[in-house]
Amino acid sequence: MRKLVLFLFICSTSATFAQENWGDLKKNKLTMKEIPPVWPGCSGSIKEIDACFNQQLSKHIMSNFKYPTLEYKENIQGRVVVSFKINTEGFVEITGVTGGNKGLQEAAKKNILKIPQLTPGMMGGKAREINMRVPFNFKTNK
């Protein structure tokens, strides 16, 4: 009988301790940081990395912008939006292209596909895909 009483006492105290250690939802709040993709050469805080990424992306688009010859000659203009994702390995994958004609769309896609391999975005310590959209305005000024 003593062994049974001792066993019940141990079980009840361990259950009580387990409840105290668990706490409530307010004490167990989980916050996960989202880290944006990192362009080669960018570093610092998350804000600095994000600002550097945007600056480098703009610089990349401007330096790789090529107006297709045929569309330029025929004064074909338009706005093209390229949707893409930066995958978990840091490579760009085109997910969609809208606007403009095929020539303008191809030029915009080629520009985006020239983005170098990046350090992928992170969430909770794991690489994750980041979706993005970039508009291209093709104007001949003729």
Question: Language-model segments: what does each one mean?
Answer:
Residues 11-14:
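N-terminal signal peptide c-region/cleavage motif recognized by signal peptidases
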Residues 5-6, 16-142:
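Charge-biased low-complexity segments
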